[in-house]
Amino acid sequence: MKSRARSSIAGGLLLSAVLAVDSLLAQQNSPLDLTGTWVWVNQEDATNRYRGVDPGGRYEGLTINDAARMRADTYSEEWVSTSPLLQCRPRGPTYQPYALDPVQIDKALDPVSRQIAAYRITVHKTAGARMIWLDDRPRPSQYAAHSWEGFSTGRFKGPVLEITSTHLKESIVTRNGVPSSFRATVIEQLFLDEPYLHWVFTVIDPDYLTEPLVRSGLYVRAPTQQLPPYPCQAEDNLPPGARTSYTVPHYLPGENPWLTETAFGFKAPLEAWRGFAEALYPEWYAIGKTLSPPAAPDIVLQPVYDDDSTRVAERADAQPESAPTSDAVESLHVAGSVYMIAGGGGNIAASIGGDGVIMVDSGAAAASDRILAAIRQAAQQLRPPERPESASPFNSTWQATHAFAEPKIRMIINTSDNPGHVDGNAAIRGSSMFGALGAGPAYQLGASSGSSQQVFAHVNVQQRMLGGNAVNAPTDTYFTDRYTLYRFFNNQAVQIFHMPNAVTDGDSTVFFRSSDVIATGDIYNSDIYPPIDLRRGGSIDGEIEALNKVLDMSVTEYMSQGGTMIIPGHGWLSDSGDVGYYRDMLMIIRDRIQNMIDKGMTLEQVKAAKPTMDYDPLYGRQPGVTARFVEAV
């Protein structure tokens, strides 16, 4: 009896020891618990935050270049309240830790290993939870869509959670218009000192910063606080169909009367407030003492912009123009049955499903084999049909549902006659994968077109190409403002809209209705200026009107992102929030150039004035793009 009791006690002690070891190991393998609700305590500019928007021209402590400085100098806060796409714009990681909003952090656990797979960070005035992935997942493609919160991965380095975020939308680093670009990377360090959470964030921006910008915020636990809802509803004060009345409030270069207000108020030299990196270092103090503050708060400053960021377009133009590379063609699923094929010239939209494939544009001829391979791969990734409720009519259900047929390309729709969008027409029509819509083998390449639609475009595109690029010319055309395909394709309507006098007189956009995807061609490019061609009927006003039509057709999911997805002619997958930014950029540059024309400036004088300088880091990095754009405007 005593022996049994001793054994029981020994077994209990052993079990307790094992559990203690397991518990200790679990604690050692677990990161610090950052979950909970946190409220703002302090940050570097805390004394300045209660007065609302930062004063114009106040950029102290920032490491911005002249391109960013010009963007901020011409910024008007009225832009945010005027644009429905900006009224509810959340703040991204480039600024959010400064924003005084309460923060809630939750865990997302792997259901099998029970380890933390991600943290969810939700901020009061944001579009939703920001996922910080801790499972070493790879970053998305360079062509993947951008968002306000970006794509974030995290890793614990001792007690510090280090977060790296990319794929960000263009945003801000201060509320008075200092921008952060869509190429920015943000690195954050979060570390716990109960009950405080220290949040250090570093912005690395090749477009708008001369060196990394490091800032910090301090938060404290608020165990009884919950985040309130944030039902931000944007207001469009324009009547339906009146987007031509929309204007972008902004200051013309050299006309902002508020750039000296802060320096005058603090009786400090203007150079201390203009955001030069060298002004952050102790040795600059002696230089600052030799400078004088402005004599009045409303002196209209005439800034001189002359650093390296002002010569982006010049350096691009000095490079020889070369054919686009097509070594890395890839497909991205967009929505529904629609994929984006990128890296083979202009972007291609492809509806892939049981009816076959409709392509919007065909890319570069040299990339045709890779484009066809990408379409074939995407088609084989489609989920096989579900097993029917009734008995199977097939001898082998698995083989019947997994035997993928060669996808048939039924039609190519060309958005314009630009070479990067049409030069693959002949090669793709001649491939074994091409089987025209509504036709059998008799209607393959070289036979009579009959009722077959093979390559489709606006009539102006066909007429122009028959005069110089006949081998790739469309076989079928439309003449009206809108054309709807005669039948549903892959279970959705396909509509084609003529956008007259935009980039050319024959531009089309293609709307896949059920998937809610619009392919714009070169009307919208997420990383270059539009290639407006006056000789072929293009114009800046027609281009802006075309973008307005795209915006009228699209909706956002929440807070100016998501919803209708936009496949641009070039660049990364976008949404209507991105298109709105692009449209506003064109309107600002148009206004600047028109002002110069009104002053009697010649084309060469306009070019020398660099009216696009602050946007060139975003859209002017390819040879000849900026010069041709300015000439067209």
What kind of feature is each model-predicted range?
Residues 355-358, 366-442, 485:
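Active-site metal-binding motif and surrounding structural segment of the metallo-beta-lactamase
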Residues 317-319, 437, 556-563, 572-633:
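Accessory terminal helices/loops
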Residues 356-358, 362-366, 380-381, 443-506, 513-514, 545-554, ...:
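Metallo-beta-lactamase
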Residues 27-315, 440-441:
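PEST-like low-complexity, intrinsically disordered acidic/proline/serine-rich tracts
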Residues 330-390, 508-522:
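Conserved beta-strand hairpin/beta-sheet module of binuclear metal-dependent hydrolase folds
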